[in-house]
Amino acid sequence: MTNIRKSHPLMKIINNAFIDLPAPSNISSWWNFGSLLGICLILQILTGLFLAMHYTSDTTTAFSSVTHICRDVNYGWLIRYLHANGASMFFICLFIHVGRGLYYGSYMFLETWNIGVILLFTVMATAFMGYVLPWGQMSFWGATVITNLLSAIPYIGTDLVEWIWGGFSVDKATLTRFFAFHFILPFVITALAAVHLLFLHETGSNNPTGIPSDMDKIPFHPYYTIKDILGALFMMLILLILVLFSPDLLGDPDNYTPANPLNTPPHIKPEWYFLFAYAILRSIPNKLGGVLAVVTSILILILMPMLHTSKQRSMMFRPVSQCLFWMVVADLITLTWIGGQPVEHPLIIIGQLASILYFLIILVLMPITSIIENNLLKW
């Protein structure tokens, strides 16, 4: 009799994806973050669903409804902070996942990589809209500033912004539609993640060496199921420490003040995971230029396969490229720091230099370094 796991139409899909999947024998812990992102997504959908049961998307009651969730709903505070800090964990995993792809040349799987970039954009859009929902000061002004950037688009900009707002300013209509989009997008993300996985399983996983591993595969279960569970436990531990000991560590105190269109906060800034982009935006004095720079800073990921000039896929055996990679990481951390600082003399120039360095390393130095390393192999 055939095993039901291998014959049942539904079980067969699960089996081929998570049980009998042939996986490289040498993939390191950097390969854990795909499954961690899946866990984050499930956590966000579940906590978000329970929050939506008590939340009201009306400008007069939104702030109060979030307070009500924290004070009156059973474990509402836990659900709310799991959701808020779960988003931070989501982005930490996302950045590491993308960084792993860049380091080990996983971007050579074109379909998987491009869907991954679309996923990144979708998650960023979802997180932005979620940040608007509590209707605090930073929610309101963050929404105003970021949506206003679209007005930099020539000819249609102003109309586009007013169309997104549903009026002449961020108001009730904006909040309602942001809630609707914030609710539906995670399901779009789930569908995209399934397609991401589908394309990945067409080629099989990459590995740290970047060398094809077809001759040395092991079954996903039990080896990588156990490994993923260990990673998940670590992540949940960090998340729970964050939620139970310092739930507001990554938030902004301004968001505990109800939204007031007549009072602008002294420093408008997004959540920490958008600060690097915000720093790039602010480093260019021109509005359209700043918007283009921000979009390019993320869209640059799509160009990675075209910028790959090395004969080796992975950076494992390319020490100079490794140095440049870690320079990009340090540069992004610098940009994140600058994005959270006020616009003052020494900080402005640091932000501008960090922004220039980011594009310089990725677009110029990395491809040239790869060519030099290719020639060094001939010695």
Swiss-Prot record:
Source species taxonomy: Eukaryota, Metazoa, Chordata, Craniata, Vertebrata
Keywords on record: Electron transport, Heme, Iron, Membrane, Metal-binding, Mitochondrion, Mitochondrion inner membrane, Respiratory chain, Transmembrane, Transmembrane helix, Transport, Ubiquinone
Cofactor binding summary note: Binds 2 heme b groups non-covalently.
Cofactor: heme b
PROSITE patterns (UniProt xref): CYTB_CTER, CYTB_NTER
GO molecular function: metal ion binding; ubiquinol-cytochrome-c reductase activity
Topology term for the membrane: Multi-pass membrane protein
GO annotation, cellular component aspect: mitochondrial inner membrane; respiratory chain complex III
Compartments reported by the entry: Mitochondrion inner membrane
Stored Pfam families: Cytochrom_B_C, Cytochrome_B
GO annotation, biological process: mitochondrial electron transport, ubiquinol to cytochrome c
Subunit structure: The cytochrome bc1 complex contains 11 subunits: 3 respiratory subunits (MT-CYB, CYC1 and UQCRFS1), 2 core proteins (UQCRC1 and UQCRC2) and 6 low-molecular weight proteins (UQCRH/QCR6, UQCRB/QCR7, UQCRQ/QCR8, UQCR10/QCR9, UQCR11/QCR10 and a cleavage product of UQCRFS1). This cytochrome bc1 complex then forms a dimer.
Transmembrane annotation, as ranges: 33-53, 77-98, 113-133, 178-198, 226-246, 288-308, 320-340, 347-367
Gene3D superfamilies: Cytochrome Bc1 Complex, Chain C
Family of this protein: Belongs to the cytochrome b family.
Disulfide bridge map: none
Further remark: Heme 1 (or BL or b562) is low-potential and absorbs at about 562 nm, and heme 2 (or BH or b566) is high-potential and absorbs at about 566 nm.
Record: residues binding heme b b566: H97, H196
Binding residue positions for a ubiquinone: H201
Protein task: Component of the ubiquinol-cytochrome c reductase complex (complex III or cytochrome b-c1 complex) that is part of the mitochondrial respiratory chain. The b-c1 complex mediates electron transfer from ubiquinol to cytochrome c. Contributes to the generation of a proton gradient across the mitochondrial membrane that is then used for ATP synthesis.
Binding-site residues for heme b b562, renumbered to this chain: H83, H182
The protein's name in its UniProt record: Cytochrome b
The keyword Membrane appears for this protein: yes
Keyword Mitochondrion on entry: yes
